[in-house]
């Protein structure tokens, strides 16, 4: 970075950092745009900005997963409005690698969450435009840190509920919630075991009108499945809970929030909170290294030739790999 660019960089960060720290939503949006950029100078600015923000601010990070049709946008708006009305500052972020191809879930949801998006104590950010999960997850994780630095009390991290996005979200949240719609036994069989194993709370939405009886049965089915599947590893005497809400009617939202707070408080008091966040930081450190190494490997001009040598049998896979690793290190 030349002297002129460095001066502009430092000046820009000195102006942006205090605005973000004061909770300015426009400044926060600009900061997240820097994080999402693929330009090296923008990435450097973003790193400097993250380092300049106040330390020690911690939001409750809540991961929300649910496939299309469960009423996720309705739930997020109703839940978010309940929180801001209780005096909480709420940010909504997304991990959706499909957004570059399909428009993503939250891109449309932002227009439907009109009340929450207009509220001065709320901030909603669509998924970044990278089409691969690694890039989206990394940018979202950094956006979470920005939101904490901006003083938000709760960060809702939404995932579309397909692929490996749930695992990525679980590695950046304090409480992971699986949102479901009322369904029969066949649909229960279709829920992936993996997501059931990481969920801290299952919330059955749309528990109203003609669907209320079905929601009651669905909730009971999942509660039973959770008891058979696992116990909470941090507390062997308890199981993840399943509960019903109606985002349309507003029923059950307070109870769900109280359960999330209770779990977070228990983890904070037991030391699990700090250990979990430390493990997550280490996980993302390794991910940053892995993605950085992959990028450097992809930029090597001799990589294709080495791969051709391996295909043709002129070199062994181990030998060719060692050549690359020796050059890198």
What positions do the PLM features span?
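Short, positively charged and aromatic/hydrophobic N-terminal segments
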Residues: 9-10
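Canonical P-loop GTPase G-domain recognition
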Residues: 201, 207-266
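Hydrophobic positions on the alpha1 helix immediately C-terminal to the Walker A/P-loop
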Residues: 75
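Conserved beta-strand segments of the P-loop GTPase G domain that flank and frequently precede/overlap
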Residues: 126-127, 178-181, 203-206, 244
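Long, well-ordered amphipathic alpha-helical subdomains in the mid-to-C-terminal portions
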Residues: 28-30, 244-247, 254-329
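Extreme N-terminal basic, low-complexity initiation segments
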Residues: 2-6
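Nucleotide-state-sensitive switch-loop elements of NTP-binding domains
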Residues: 14-70, 79-165, 172-179, 185-187
């Amino acid at each position: 970075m030349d002297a002129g660019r460095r001066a502009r960089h430092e000046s820009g960060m000195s102006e942006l950092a205090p605005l973000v720290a004061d909770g300015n939503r426009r400044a926060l949006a600009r900061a997240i745009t820097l994080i999402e950029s693929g330009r090296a100078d923008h990435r450097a600015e973003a790193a400097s900005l993250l380092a300049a923000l106040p330390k020690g601010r911690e939001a409750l990070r809540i991961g929300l997963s649910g496939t299309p049709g469960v009423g996720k946008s309705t739930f997020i708006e109703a839940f978010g409005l309940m929180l801001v009305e209780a005096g909480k500052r709420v940010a909504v972020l997304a991990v959706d690698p499909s957004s570059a191809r399909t428009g993503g879930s939250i891109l449309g949801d932002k227009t439907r969450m009109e009340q929450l998006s207009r509220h001065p104590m709320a901030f909603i950010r669509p998924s970044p435009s990278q089409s691969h999960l690694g890039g989206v997850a990394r940018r979202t994780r950094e956006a979470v840190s920005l939101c904490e630095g901006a003083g938000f009390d709760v960060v809702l991290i939404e995932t579309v509920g397909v692929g490996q996005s749930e695992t990525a979200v679980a590695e950046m949240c304090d409480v992971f919630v699986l949102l479901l719609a009322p369904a029969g036994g066949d649909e229960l069989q279709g829920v992936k075991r993996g997501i059931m194993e990481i969920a801290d709370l299952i919330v059955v939405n749309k528990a109203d009108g003609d669907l209320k009886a079905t929601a009651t049965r669905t909730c009971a089915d999942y509660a039973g499945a959770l008891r058979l599947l696992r116990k909470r590893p941090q507390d062997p005497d308890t199981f993840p809970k399943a509960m019903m809400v109606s985002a349309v009617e507003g029923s059950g939202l307070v109870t769900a929030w109280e359960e999330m707070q209770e779990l977070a408080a228990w983890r904070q008091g037991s030391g699990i909170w700090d250990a979990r966040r430390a493990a997550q930081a280490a996980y993302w450190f390794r991910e940053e290294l892995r993605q950085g190494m992959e990028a450097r490997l992809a930029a090597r001009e001799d990589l294709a030739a080495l791969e051709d040598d391996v295909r043709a049998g002129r070199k062994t896979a181990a030998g060719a790999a060692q050549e690359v690793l020796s050059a890198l290190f």
